[in-house]
Amino acid sequence: MSSELAAPPGVVWERIASMDGINHELSPWFRMTAPAGLALSPELVPLGRRWFRSWILLFGVIPFDYDDLCVEELEPGRRFLERSTMLSARVWEHERTLDPVGDGGTRLTDRVRFQPRIRLLTGIHRTIIAATFRHRHRRLRTHFSSTMTASA
């Protein structure tokens, strides 16, 4: 899924690389936790190994899943690749890229791959993940007051 945002990549990166920004994208449906005082600073990210466990809270309060967050690749201001395990998924892979477009805008692209622990739930997972990323992109477009349209 991709969206064009009415802000330069550096501004978009600042937003998406912060817990406040991540949780704004997910709200009001979900919230992710992080250790108190954690800085999402590129030089502090331990590439290729578990960084921390983030609880995923339904409606911001009900724990229903966790993400053992592992950032495999990081290009600050441009791209990250997360390859983690979750309570619900044996494999969770999320790649997000930022590319400059037009007159100071950014194309933000998310690519997700997952393997649920329970195969029978694959369809439900796919539906929830697609809806969640549509919601996240809508929140980002609103936040950056984009006049561009989304493409899936």
Q: Where are the predicted features?
A:
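Hydrophobic pocket/interface hotspot
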Residues: 12-16, 22, 52, 71, ...
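A non-catalytic, amphipathic alpha-helix used as a structural packing/dimerization or gating element
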Residues: 131-139
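Short strand-connecting beta-turns/loops that link adjacent beta-strands
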Residues: 8, 76, 101-105
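Generic C-terminal helix-cap and adjacent flexible tail
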Residues: 145-152
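Hydrophobic ligand-binding cavity/cleft-lining segments
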Residues: 1-46
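Generic structural detector for well-ordered beta-strands
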Residues: 2-6, 70, 97-99, 113
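Beta-strand/loop substructures that line and gate deep hydrophobic ligand-binding cavities in soluble
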Residues: 81-131
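Glycine-rich portal/gate segments that line the openings of hydrophobic small-molecule binding cavities
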Residues: 34-85, 146
